[in-house]
Amino acid sequence: MALRFPRFSQGLAQDPTTRRIWFGIATAHDFESHDDITEERLYQNIFASHFGQLAIIFLWTSGNLFHVAWQGNFETWIQDPLHVRPIAHAIWDPHFGQPAVEAFTRGGALGPVNIAYSGVYQWWYTIGLRTNEDLYTGALFLLFLSALSLIGGWLHLQPKWKPRVSWFKNAESRLNHHLSGLFGVSSLAWTGHLVHVAIPASRGEYVRWNNFLNVLPHPQGLGPLFTGQWNLYAQNPDSSSHLFGTSQGSGTAILTLLGGFHPQTQSLWLTDMAHHHLAIAILFLIAGHMYRTNFGIGHSIKDLLEAHIPPGGRLGRGHKGLYDTINNSIHFQLGLALASLGVITSLVAQHMYSLPAYAFIAQDFTTQAALYTHHQYIAGFIMTGAFAHGAIFFIRDYNPEQNEDNVLARMLDHKEAIISHLSWASLFLGFHTLGLYVHNDVMLAFGTPEKQILIEPIFAQWIQSAHGKTSYGFDVLLSSTNGPAFNAGRSIWLPGWLSAINENSNSLFLTIGPGDFLVHHAIALGLHTTTLILVKGALDARGSKLMPDKKDFGYSFPCDGPGRGGTCDISAWDAFYLAVFWMLNTIGWVTFYWHWKHITLWQGNVSQFNESSTYLMGWLRDYLWLNSSQLINGYNPFGMNSLSVWAWMFLFGHLVWATGFMFLISWRGYWQELIETLAWAHERTPLANLIRWKDKPVALSIVQARLVGLAHFSVGYIFTYAAFLIASTSGKFG
């Protein structure tokens, strides 16, 4: 008999129903559950799949470069980055006739094109790329890396090149190599690129392989490095009148601490960024030599952890047993990695707009909005994944004997206190924030806006003042003009910072008021509730008072029969499922807030946000409705416009989102009956009945239907907001 899908599970392959396909897809990546899996094969499969992942990433970025070089307008855009719209790629087959062709022919193109809102043009321009040839070269290089990754993945599955489990579990060596190699050497290499290619390009000097060895990045060469006069590299920076990409007003410094932004590009100084990467490189190169490997010097992580026993015994046996627990659990390691990556991704969102690193990106408002929203959503999914794998760790990998009375065991011991405190915080935030919003709504409805409860965020304003924002008049730390820190800041460190923070044209430390106070607490409610659901899901994954033997049922189970007073919806998977809705909800509020505040800032009518954001009707009317009006008006008697495609996507996003509810709100029996009816009709319809299927159609399980519903809900939600965000921003700022 031919092997049927899924090959990794003979039990499933013999299932006569369509369950075989669904369960096969669901468990394809759950290597631990596959037939004949050993620990060694598990690690090797994961290792090989990393190479595949890298190949996909390199291929994707190569495609970006290739399509812009082929169909974009990079060389034209460089001449006037503020007024030429960057083209992502051509549209091969514009539907809806001539009006559509005209609507989408822009950015100086000959035919219909898509505009790039990803910031790649600004990025490539900043790092020194200048011609289409440069882009093609980059695309080919990444294609080569992609092929190399695929070969690497294949190679490490061959018997001779398969790494052993002991190699995968050598934590010290891995940490050393990742710190020194991944972070240290790559940061050093990037500093090299900035100093040798990007900074000269910003000063009008075109450095490529043919003249790479002849052009000195600094007039004094390596002299100052070897004589210890490092300050020479910071002397004579670019002036405030410097025109980016030309020698006009340029200096010779390569490593500076100017602070603030380049006046023309509104982005961080390239020489500051080179300095930053050099510092990071040195830090990580040192960090990558700290752990004990073959040479018997340096720290052993196990010894470090075992030594962590707090005085007074208040945390029991401290970190004893943690080393082996983490080192032997892939889920624990993945959970830690995802938690770190999630935080970093959210920080990227925050810093890309407040401290823009790429030339002219701060003036490309749609790109700013798209990048912020994109990174916040990605961060949300990654963070929920961290807790999901934390829960799987507790179910599959946690060994109570190994962790007796250490910090991990103690988390489980007092989980009720943790969960109840989080619950209390969520309830407090929710009722108080909603109470304030609703009170203000009622006051406006009754025509007495002066009776609103408006709370100034004085603590946040104080923190902003401490960093140098003077408009609140707090006169503290860096905003105190006669303090030593303020005076030192003018000359020794970051002289540009104080002028940047008090400029009103950037997004640094935006002025905040009562509307910000309220939405901040709404977001805090979302964060705490999402965390509550995720933490409870993980801490109760092994068992709860209602169901002490939960871990025997695995990560996801629908119900445990009618006993125990009802055990539906209490698996660790159900917690993850519920948390994703709250995560999307929270990031919705975050992105609404960011977008509305910035739209009013860019349009120069900040009072609209300040006055309308203190009550819910203001958000619904002056943000959502006002900004979606162009989208709801996509097709009208005047024909197509360039927003029509977003209007269609806005509708389509709502459709996908609403389809989610068909799977989320249902009961099981009627699905099966519906399927039987459809199958019956199919078999009795001429022509259609020529097509037969081998598997008996069965309805999705409860858990599967929830997953399908969740996927539609999430995708539709994000599609809808993406269309709204891009159309409302690009419609205003061209």
UniProtKB/Swiss-Prot annotation:
**Which reaction equations make up its catalytic activity?**
reduced [plastocyanin] + hnu + oxidized [2Fe-2S]-[ferredoxin] = oxidized [plastocyanin] + reduced [2Fe-2S]-[ferredoxin]
Give one GO term, molecular function aspect: magnesium ion binding
Where does this protein have coiled-coil stretches? Answer: none
Cite the binding residues for phylloquinone: W671
Q: Which Gene3D superfamilies match?
A: Photosystem I PsaA/PsaB (1.20.1130.10)
- The secretion signal range is none
- Which residues does the annotation say bind chlorophyll a B1? H654
Query: Which amino acid positions bind chlorophyll a B3, per UniProt?
Result: M662, Y670
Q: Which SUPFAM superfamilies does its entry note?
A: Photosystem I subunits PsaA/PsaB
Q: What keywords are assigned to this protein?
A: 4Fe-4S, Chlorophyll, Chloroplast, Chromophore, Electron transport, Iron, Iron-sulfur, Magnesium, Membrane, Metal-binding, Oxidoreductase, Photosynthesis, Photosystem I, Plastid, Thylakoid, Transmembrane, Transmembrane helix, Transport
**Chief place of localization:** plastid
Cofactor info, note text: P700 is a chlorophyll a/chlorophyll a' dimer, A0 is one or more chlorophyll a, A1 is one or both phylloquinones and FX is a shared 4Fe-4S iron-sulfur center.
Q: Which InterPro entries match?
A: PSI_PsaA/B, PSI_PsaA/B_CS, PSI_PsaA/B_sf, PSI_PsaB
Question: EC number(s) on record?
Answer: 1.97.1.12
Please indicate if the UniProt record lists Thylakoid as a keyword: yes
Bilayer-crossing residues are 46-69, 135-158, 175-199, 273-291, 330-353, 369-395, 417-439, 517-535, 575-596, 643-665, 707-727
Q: Which GO terms describe its cellular component?
A: chloroplast thylakoid membrane; photosystem I
Q: Which residues bind [4Fe-4S] cluster?
A: C559, C568
Name its GO BP terms in alphabetical order. photosynthesis
Q: Where in the cell is it found?
A: Plastid, Chloroplast thylakoid membrane
User: Where on the tree of life does the source sit, at the highest rank?
Assistant: Eukaryota
Q: How does it sit in the membrane?
A: Multi-pass membrane protein
Concerning its family, UniProt says: Belongs to the PsaA/PsaB family.
- Role: PsaA and PsaB bind P700, the primary electron donor of photosystem I (PSI), as well as the electron acceptors A0, A1 and FX. PSI is a plastocyanin-ferredoxin oxidoreductase, converting photonic excitation into a charge separation, which transfers an electron from the donor P700 chlorophyll pair to the spectroscopically characterized acceptors A0, A1, FX, FA and FB in turn. Oxidized P700 is reduced on the lumenal side of the thylakoid membrane by plastocyanin.
Q: Tell me, how does this one assemble?
A: The PsaA/B heterodimer binds the P700 chlorophyll special pair and subsequent electron acceptors. PSI consists of a core antenna complex that captures photons, and an electron transfer chain that converts photonic excitation into a charge separation. The eukaryotic PSI reaction center is composed of at least 11 subunits.
What name has this protein been given in UniProt? Photosystem I P700 chlorophyll a apoprotein A2
Q: Which organism is it from?
A: Lobularia maritima (Sweet alyssum)
Gene it is expressed from: psaB
